[in-house]
Amino acid sequence: MPKILTFNEDARHALERGVNALADVVKVTIGPRGRNVVIDQSYGAATITNDGVTIARLVELEDPYENLGAQLAKEVATKTNDVAGDGTTTATVLAQAMVRFGLKQVTAGAAPLSLKLGIEAAVEAVSAALLEQAIEVSSRQTIAQVAAISAQDTQVGELIAEAIDKIGKDGVITVEESQTLGLDLELTEGMQFDKGYISPYFVTDADSQEAILEDAYVLLYPGKISALNEILPILEQVVQERKPLLIIAEDIEGEALSTLVVNSIRKTFQVVAVKAPGFGDRRKALLQDIAVLTGGQVVAGEVGLSLDAVTLADLGRARRVVVDKENTTIVDGGGEADAVADRVRQLKAEIETSDSDWDREKLQERLAKLAGGVAVIRVGAATEVELKEKKHRLEDAVSATRAAIEEGIVAGGGAALAHVTSVLDDGLGRTGDELAGVRIVRTALDAPLNWIARNAGLEGAVIVARVKDLAPGHGYNAATGEYTDLIAAGVIDPVKVTRSAVANAASIAALLITTESLVVEKPAVSDGDHGHSHGHGHSHGHSHPQGPGF
């Protein structure tokens, strides 16, 4: 495809127009008095949301140069969402301010690379100052406040706090759509995986259609079991102990399955067979997780074990096992606490080093099954549009809560950023254009508070000046219209969210102000554009709009 190019001021200002177009749409949502944005979609109902990243992802501009700028701003929102799960609107507002002030400096003759160095130094200082101010999140009340601020709903805050209270800080919280109105919290106790019994003949409770085993042995095998003589020795040992048995294997079929079913029907002994969760290497890892949790061994040739040589010492134990048609839940496994803790540490290390989002998600699920539990928040609404909006807010609130637990909290409402500008007052010892770079960040940090105030119908600059005169931790509560101790009032932001917003905004702004040329694909020209005037009052001649610089 042929390309078209533009250079210098034209290029940078085209990018700025694109950043402004996206930021102007997003920033009307910031703060408790922010508005919603309605987005038309090519399929289904329109989306109504105040979630910055959702809005950003759906914005495409017609002008190819300006669209490049919008895509850069979109990257700020998506990267912040990936790292912290919230703060996407704040990040976009910061990026717009940094780009505006940065380009003014470039136009005035400042060296772009020196500005970039100053911006990077300022971000590092701001990040360190925010971490220093951070207050650890430990109480249920604080967790509820973080979630409530993000979702703008105290009921959501209480529900998320209850979930974390019950499943622990490493547990997983998922948000699902419900057919009924309102919010509902369901907690999964112990380890659960999405495989049910192989045969309904294993059911022990006809009413609930569940197989329930008390004080059970657990046999873990990564392959298929079909021959009875392979498992007969261990079955005889389990029968002598008068204990139920859970068999988890890739598959159980043929003679082995029919024998287990017959014994289950005759109540000779209690047994349930289920397929192992996952596939390939992930299946092996999940089986090993279950082995650690139950205190057993995975019966595999790699560790010198074969099915016909298994003893009771190789089996895991569980106080209770509940198996239904679709899921298996192991409650109170008999594994050593130290072994489980070691496995948890190993999984956390793998999560930190993984560079794949999918792998990280699956590792996080495994961690949750071992370390905490799984809480499912089901959300319902009267219409599909409202349901999507509620689900977005819930997902943001869950992410914000996780971020707060990880790094702590600071005052919300844009106050923490307005106060932290004081660490940049001395210019960090920089001079010349690097000092100008520091000042770009210092000025831009006021933008979120400015827009929170403006969305509340107030003069942003006046509110910013007043907040800077207050003590750290104090600021303007736009929900009540009062200047107050924001932390005491529960107006708080996770440090991780705030730091990520600043860092990602600065990263894109620094790249944009050092841009000197743009290269885009030349738009395809339709046949109708080559015609001549047909007397309808519209030009169909050869005059085509050109991008900046042409």
UniProtKB/Swiss-Prot annotation:
Compartments, record wording: Cytoplasm
Chain segments annotated as transmembrane: none
PROSITE patterns documented for this protein: CHAPERONINS_CPN60 (PS00296)
EC number assigned by the record: 5.6.1.7
InterPro entries hit by this protein: Chaperonin_Cpn60_CS, Cpn60/GroEL, Cpn60/GroEL/TCP-1, GroEL-like_apical_dom_sf, GROEL-like_equatorial_sf, TCP-1-like_intermed_sf
Signal peptide boundaries: none
ATP-binding in keyword set: yes
Residue span of region Disordered: 524-550
Reaction catalysed by this enzyme: ATP + H2O + a folded polypeptide = ADP + phosphate + an unfolded polypeptide
Protein's UniProt keywords contain Isomerase: yes
Chief place where the protein resides: cytoplasm
Gene Ontology molecular functions: ATP binding; ATP-dependent protein folding chaperone; isomerase activity; unfolded protein binding
Origin: domain of life: Bacteria
Keywords, comma-separated and alphabetical: ATP-binding, Chaperone, Cytoplasm, Isomerase, Nucleotide-binding
A cellular component annotation (GO) from this entry: cytoplasm
SUPFAM superfamilies hit by this protein: GroEL apical domain-like, GroEL equatorial domain-like, GroEL-intermediate domain like
Residues that bind ATP: T29, I30, G31, P32, D86, G87, T88, T89, T90, G413, N477, A478, A479, D493
HAMAP family in UniProt: CH60 (MF_00600)
Family membership: Belongs to the chaperonin (HSP60) family.
Oligomer status and interactors: Forms a cylinder of 14 subunits composed of two heptameric rings stacked back-to-back. Interacts with the co-chaperonin GroES.
Function, in words: Together with its co-chaperonin GroES, plays an essential role in assisting protein folding. The GroEL-GroES system forms a nano-cage that allows encapsulation of the non-native substrate proteins and provides a physical environment optimized to promote and accelerate protein folding.
This protein's name: Chaperonin GroEL 1
Taxonomic source organism: Frankia alni (strain DSM 45986 / CECT 9034 / ACN14a)
Organism phylogeny: Bacteria, Bacillati, Actinomycetota, Actinomycetes, Frankiales
Gene coding for it: groEL1
